[in-house]
């Protein structure tokens, strides 16, 4: 049974539509002396784009199957995931409740009210603030219980949409990448931001089957490689099991030198990467995820960390709305 056929066994809403572009970054390639390509998941069609829409195709389909009328999720005040979940809820006529934290403890007005947070108000989200998401699964379960007591039928969407069901979205994306690359380019490496781990795990499972010669590198955005690896591995294993795969799982490669000082806080290397891509290619990265992932790619080339010198694919997971929240730092 093909990977495509296995995916059809899971209910899925068509939210992404056509395949997102896969393009060569010609000016960046000339600048670096290395072929760099980009998968433009920043231009998925709902609410200013981003990778979470692929996960929500499966998660929202499951919510509707279960008869839910409310999506309950959590994240940072500037969460791209919460923004996209809220937009999908609005599109489907569902209520949305979001549990938010301020992970960087800032009082800057732009962070508290602009960017993704502004969009939550437009989508009519019921926002609940908490001190910290120390145990998000338990906190979401408790919030769902309260929502249910109010007469709603909640469906919990995990942080980042990252569980085995949501990660199917990036198995699906792997099929897109393989089809777009076929006969055109043979990638030696694929670089992606690794945070809640679902995108990374989905690509790990999909690309292992479809582009086995490409090394997948996750650039961590919130924790060390030792802390991140079990998170990726847990979803990777659950995903492979759900798809009936019995082959040994692909090795998890993580680079963790680019997320400091912490999740959600910009750093010089990430901001430099944002400015470089904007000025060379007219493409916007963000200071939380893709800026740091691109910083990893740039440093990886400079430090000769890639396994060979073939073309590199960068997965652009979106996040540009957060730029407005981080002014004037960016």
Curated annotation (Swiss-Prot):
Location of N6-(pyridoxal phosphate)lysine modifications: 52
Cofactor(s) the protein requires to work: pyridoxal 5'-phosphate
Catalytic activity reported: D-cysteine + H2O = hydrogen sulfide + pyruvate + NH4(+) + H(+)
GO terms for biological process, alphabetical: D-amino acid metabolic process
Protein task: Catalyzes the alpha,beta-elimination reaction of D-cysteine and of several D-cysteine derivatives. It could be a defense mechanism against D-cysteine.
HAMAP family the UniProt entry points to: D_Cys_desulfhydr (MF_01045)
Name of the molecule in the record: D-cysteine desulfhydrase
Highest classification ranks of the organism: Bacteria, Pseudomonadati, Pseudomonadota, Gammaproteobacteria, Enterobacterales
């Amino acid at each position: 049974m093909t990977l495509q056929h296995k995916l059809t066994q899971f209910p899925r809403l068509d939210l992404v539509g056509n395949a997102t572009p896969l393009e060569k970054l010609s000016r960046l390639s000339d600048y670096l002396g290395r072929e760099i390509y980009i998968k433009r998941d920043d231009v998925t069609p709902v609410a200013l784009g981003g990778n979470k829409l692929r996960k929500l195709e499966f998660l929202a389909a499951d919510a509707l199957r279960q008869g839910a009328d409310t999506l309950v999720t959590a994240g940072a005040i500037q969460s791209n995931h919460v923004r996209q979940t809220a937009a999908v809820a609005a599109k489907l006529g569902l209520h949305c409740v979001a549990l938010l934290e301020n992970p960087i403890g800032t009082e800057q007005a732009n962070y508290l009210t602009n960017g993704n947070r502004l969009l939550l108000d437009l989508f009519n989200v019921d926002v609940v603030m908490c001190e910290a998401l120390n145990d998000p699964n338990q906190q979401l379960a408790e919030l769902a219980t309260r929502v249910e007591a109010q007469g709603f039928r909640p469906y919990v969407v995990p942080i980042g949409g990252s569980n085995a069901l949501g990660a199917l979205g990036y198995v699906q994306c792997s099929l897109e990448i393989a089809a777009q690359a076929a006969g055109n380019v043979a990638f030696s490496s694929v670089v992606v931001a690794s945070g809640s781990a679902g995108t990374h795990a989905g690509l790990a499972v999909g690309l292992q089957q479809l582009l086995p010669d490409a090394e997948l590198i996750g650039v961590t955005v919130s924790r060390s490689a030792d802390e991140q690896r079990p998170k990726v591995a847990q979803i990777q294993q659950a995903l492979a099991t759900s798809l009936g795969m019995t082959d040994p799982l692909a090795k998890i490669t993580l680079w963790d030198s680019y997320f400091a000082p912490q999740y959600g806080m910009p750093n010089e290397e990430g901001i430099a990467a944002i400015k470089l891509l904007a000025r060379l290619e007219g493409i916007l990265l963000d200071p939380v995820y893709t800026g740091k992932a691109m910083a990893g790619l740039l440093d990886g080339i400079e430090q000769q960390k890639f396994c060979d010198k073939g073309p590199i694919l960068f997965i652009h997971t979106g996040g540009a709305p957060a730029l407005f929240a981080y002014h004037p730092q960016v």
